[in-house]
Amino acid sequence: MGQVSRRGLIVGLASGAVASTFSVTASATIVRALSLSALVQGSRRIVVVTALASESHFEELGRRRRIVTDTRVRVEEGLAKADGVDRELLVRTLGGAIGDLGERVHGQAQLVLDEPCVAFLLQGPDGLHYVNGMAQGHYPLRGAGTRKLGRSADLPEILDFNNSAVKALVGSELGSAGARIRALVTP
């Protein structure tokens, strides 16, 4: 094995430093855009909820043992398709932590305790609710007075972003977002 010259070592280290300084973090999670219309039409309930408590446990999904988190939420307001909705619902998301073991599912909605959000929900045959479109169906509310819809914390890169529900809703005031959503509900 040959020796490395001092000049070669310095050039190599400098190249590595420059590459790491100007590199961009790669993201492997990419999803197709859900339009606002598709999100509204595909949802069973569209509500403002606040997470009250959550519990993670193992569940058999597709013949594999996975961690899921069940979050008890309080329904603060029905925006659309909310007739007969209970005051509290159980919402299941993929991933979570049990003791020292954790499982993260990129692109999943993160229901944060005591943080109100707009949630586009599906209801499974088991009676549990699920966030439609994962993070594309979850919008944390920001601000005290006029609340605005924010971007979900674990939202991945979205293909065709300009036609997405995220583009249409993030930054909107809750009242105007609710009106846009209700206008898309078909009887």
Model-derived regions, located:
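Secretory targeting signals
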Residues: 1-4, 15-19
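Netrin-like (NTR/C345C) domain of secreted extracellular proteins
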Residues: 4-11, 25-27, 100-187
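Basic, polyanion-binding surface patches
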Residues: 11-12, 26-136
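C-terminal segment of classical bacterial N-terminal signal peptides
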Residues: 19-25
